[in-house]
From Swiss-Prot:
InterPro entries in alphabetical order: Kinesin-like_fam, Kinesin_motor_CS, Kinesin_motor_dom, Kinesin_motor_dom_sf, P-loop_NTPase
Organism: Mus musculus (Mouse)
PROSITE patterns: KINESIN_MOTOR_1, KINESIN_MOTOR_2
Database matches in Gene3D superfamilies: Kinesin motor domain
Biased composition (Pro residues): 538-548
Skewed-composition ranges (Basic and acidic residues): 1-13
Binding-site list for ATP: 104-111
Sequence ranges of Polar residues compositional bias: 610-642
Region (Disordered): 1-25, 531-561, 579-642
Record protein name field: Kinesin-like protein KIF12
Length: 642
């Protein structure tokens, strides 16, 4: 048979051992309500069987074990004694934080267990035999306070969590939702919550009845008085002593204990209860908060929960129960179930929930008074201060043995070193920025200079063409000479007399001399110059062609004309464009413009050299031309066959 849950004993005996400083498990008491009149009419039988005082039998194979198991025949007084609430009250008087909360399905008797049956009318008290845990605890607590030697201050607060909003059930003004805050000293608390001080049982009962009358409830198929909200009533107990001083921080709570009673709304299935509209929204909100509570309980059971994040902030309910579940308080859980077989799925869920909850352990902490310390703590603090004093004296002696000012000098040197490195980095950054600006400026100047040089080359070519007028169309026949396939159309001197021009730039094309005219063209041979290539005696390409009707040979140019042409060519080649800014220092100062300031135009220098060679070749040819005789054949007569 599978048996779940193994508590160490009943709550009363466990709490007698003293919870302070040790791990204390959450105590769970199970109560099975009796069969209702409707269930008896349907002929249902109980699906749960209590085997002794601590075991609940669900089936022959499944059983659950808790601190105490109470069947439907137990009275309210039996439940109060079995839960050990008196011991929780004693711990609250000693300054501990104690919590009692009920959990279970809707209609399982949670509110009845805590507060008894609802009042039959206004001013009609509940019979003493039917009073719940809260009324019995109030009666016992006030009687216990009267027999104490020191005065005790009692205060009460009452709130409900409805649709994830906190409402004050004791508020004197108009009801409004209150925020939940968190501080390191107090943990989670409700801001602006009214706390009422009382001194008698009658005053406390009036506060309880006021809260119960304001609490929201409704009816559905499973419960005629179903609570639609979670309710928390807290009793604050403070016992001032002669050594006690008020807290320094106004956010800190007063020194003392508290006793909190939590009546959770029951979990329900909308399909089973038939809830619609507002009831369905309330059921969803209730189930969502209970699901968050179950998730926190599951994470608290993890052995490595110190490394896990417990999501107490997922709902307002888990925020206010964070200290009771996983903090420094003592917690008692009363699980209420229904014996009906129709509610068996929800009953099993509640049993598993309670079985997991009783395995959660807390570390209760007693009251912390800022003016009073235990003797053991004072002795430990004294030993710690003595050890710290010896350590500081040893460090002081070590500082005296070293050179005076050495530590300060090292610190100053380190600071200066860091400051110097920072200054160097800043200067280097500024230098790089300036160099980048200079490079960009030089790049722009080089591009401008390249454009100027390209324009200069273009002007030189145009001026060269202007010195070589085109022959009139139809004046001379087409020359049948063969063109040399060169990469550049005007890169191979010397030129033939028949002028071929580039169709694009109109520059005379370089080609071999006409083979049909070689026999008729007069040549000047100089055998004394070996390796010398014979040149044509005809005028240069830029000379004007003879007119068709003229029989005279072209006029020979004088030496002064050729000198003037040479001077003109040197002037053309010597022109230089002065840039608006100094060029880049990328090469030597005597480097041609096409190579300064970075990459220039690739064909600029060869084109200039080609023009220079053409002009020099023509000038050289004209100087070596002999004086024409009268019997020499005129050039105009030799053009008849071309």
């Amino acid at each position: 048979m599978e048996e779940r849950g193994s508590p160490d004993g009943d709550p009363a005996r466990n709490l007698e051992q003293g919870p302070e400083g040790s791990e204390t498990p959450i105590q769970v008491v199970l109560r099975v309500r009796p069969m209702s009149t409707v269930e008896l009419r349907r002929g249902e039988q109980s699906a749960l069987h209590c085997s002794g005082t601590r075991t609940l039998q669900v089936s022959p194979d499944v059983a659950f074990r808790f601190g105490a198991v109470l069947d439907g025949a137990r009275t309210q007084e039996d439940v109060f004694r079995a839960c050990g609430v008196k011991r929780l009250g004693e711990l609250a008087l000693r300054g501990f934080s104690c919590t009692v909360f009920t959990f279970g399905q809707t209609g399982s008797g949670k509110t009845y267990t805590l507060t008894g049956p609802p009042p039959q009318g206004e001013g009609v008290p509940v019979p003493p035999s039917l009073a719940g845990i809260m009324q019995r605890t109030f009666t016992w607590l006030l009687d216990r306070v009267q027999h104490l030697d020191s005065p005790v201050t009692l205060r009460a607060s009452y709130l409900e969590i409805y649709n994830e909003q906190v409402w004050d059930l004791l508020s004197l003004g108009s009801p409004r939702p209150l925020p939940v805050r968190w501080t390191k000293a107090r943990g989670f608390y409700v801001e602006q919550l009214r706390v009422v001080e009382f001194g008698s049982l009658e005053a406390l009962m009036e506060l309880l009845q006021m809260g119960l009358s304001r609490r929201r409830s409704s009816s559905h198929t499973l419960n005629q008085a179903s609570s639609r909200s979670h309710a928390l009533l807290t009793l604050h107990i403070s016992r001032p002593t002669s050594q006690q001083v008020p807290p320094v921080d106004l956010g800190e709570p007063p020194v003392g204990g508290k006793l909190c009673f939590v009546d959770l709304a029951g979990s329900e299935k909308v399909a089973a209860t038939g809830s619609q509209g507002q009831l369905m929204l309330e059921a969803n909100s209730i189930n969502r908060s209970l699901l968050a509570l179950g998730h926190c309980i599951s994470l608290l059971l993890d052995p490595q929960r110190k490394q896990n994040h417990i999501p107490f902030r997922d709902s307002k309910l888990t925020k206010l129960l964070a200290d009771s579940l996983g903090g420094r308080g003592v917690t008692l859980m009363v699980a209420c179930v229904s014996p009906s077989a129709q509610c068996l799925p929800e009953t099993l869920s509640t049993l598993r929930y309670a079985s997991r909850a009783q395995r959660i352990t807390t570390r209760p902490q007693g009251p912390k008074s800022p003016g009073v310390k235990p003797p053991q703590q004072v002795e430990n603090e004294l030993l710690r201060l003595q050890e710290e004093n010896r350590h500081l004296r040893f460090q002081l002696d070590q500082m005296h043995t070293t050179a005076p000012g050495a530590h300060g000098a090292r610190m100053a040197w380190a600071q200066r070193n860091l400051y110097g490195m920072l200054q160097e980095f800043m200067l280097e950054n500024e230098r790089l920025r300036k160099e980048m600006r200079q490079l960009r400026s030089s790049r722009d100047l080089a591009r401008a200079e390249q454009r100027v040089l390209a324009q200069q080359v273009h002007d030189l070519e145009r001026r060269l063409l202007s010195a070589c007028p085109l022959p009139q169309q139809g004046s001379t026949p087409v020359c049948p000479c063969r063109m040399v396939p060169a990469a550049s159309c005007h890169a191979l001197p010397p030129l033939c007399y028949c002028h071929h021009f580039c169709p694009l730039c109109r520059v005379p094309l370089a080609h071999w001399t006409c083979p049909r005219r070689e026999c008729h063209m007069p040549q000047v041979l100089e055998p004394e110059a070996p390796g010398h290539i014979s040149q044509s005696v005809w005028p240069p390409p830029w000379a004007p062609p003879p007119s068709p009707g003229s029989a005279k040979p072209p006029r020979e140019r004088s030496q002064s004309d050729w000198t003037q042409t040479r001077v003109l060519a040197e002037m053309l080649m010597g022109e230089e464009v002065v840039p608006s800014a100094p060029p880049l220092s990328a090469g030597p100062s005597n480097m041609p413009y096409g190579l300064r300031g970075g990459s220039g135009i690739p064909n600029l220098t060869p084109r200039l050299e080609t023009l220079t060679q053409q002009i020099n070749s023509s000038l050289h040819l004209s100087q070596r031309q002999p004086q024409p005789s009268e019997d020499t054949q005129s050039p105009g007569q030799g053009l008849s066959s071309c």
